[in-house]
């Protein structure tokens, strides 16, 4: 890992306003508890088999294909609730394109993880809330397996923030010297357009085994 300044961890209340926030459009529901109309598969018009709606939540058990939003987003404020099973591993991608075989080759990822038992818990670079393999998240804000956690991703231009349960975990600047060095030191160095799209799809990772649920997925375009 590059010896660079760690991402800033700030314990901030949920009501705090992200840097540079301005009046914006109303939130749009990407999942309303009853329909997958806002979603499809990666490079596919239909949602992958294995995702289902149960009790107002979007769920899966076992390894399935990734979901991507039908719409693309540039500057946005995304909020969702997630619940993961024991040893579970997943993620939320943002500004993803479909130029590569997999969305994670182009899109930054907000990591979703069981930090206690998942194999990826060996480093904070891959624990819950991290910008996967690029910026670490601080410990202490994740609710246990079986409980709902609340994730928030705020992206305005190159500035990105990751929030968990009302606490800002990290922030970074795409294209900065620090970001560039970290990406170069990661597995994403093989993909020259990783993280560089100004707008793209939201993605929900399904290709790891185990149970996973989402609910109350809402996004607001920032102006």
Task: Cite the ranges covered by each PLM segment.
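Carbohydrate-interacting regions of secretory-pathway proteins
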Residues: 10-223
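Bacterial N-terminal signal peptides
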Residues: 1-9
